[in-house]
Amino acid sequence: TCGSNKALYGTVRVAEADCYDQPGDKALTEIVKEVEAEAAEWREYVRKKEKWDKLQRLLRDPGVDLDAIPPELMDGLDNLDRPPQSKYGHAPRLALLVDDCQGTKLFTTGSNNTFGHLCIKHRHVGEGLGLSVFILCQNFASPGACNRFIRQNATHLMLFRERDEEVMDKVAAEASGVHWSREEFLAAHRYAVSQGQHDF
């Protein structure tokens, strides 16, 4: 999908190295390692920034003897004149976009499903840095499509126009609940897909 949708993904600057054409455990392991590396880099930036801030407070304090400043406060700081810079200017915001993977190992059932486990613990990957997971699929609950335990952990659902009432009943049964009744969900969906130029 990454190769065939290059024109679409070009606006979000997806690097070639960030595309995985063979969905499976190996790709997921590499992705989690990348998240952990981003988290380690961010933690190192935070550590350096805290040291730099502390050093600056001491340097600005007229009551502090400069010779008494611990030298370890300067260790690892690349530039004493300006604060350390983070890679993005903020904490990394990482996302995994899974597209056209229906029928692959990602959506197998069973307790050994690595992708299912990642979807459930995505907020805790990278020591809490997290990884948002976006799943694009054409079938809500067909065999080989998005597993029920993944759907039950979803926080958002973008649902396009669907004319098959059985499918809509299934979606409504899973998506309604505390905040919506089945009827309210179906009415909201009918309203949403009938408005404007978008049918979702």
Please provide the spans of the model-predicted regions:
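Conserved P-loop NTPase motor cores
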Residues: 1-9, 14, 22-32, 49-50, ...
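Conserved AAA+ ATPase small/helical "lid" subdomain
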Residues: 179-200
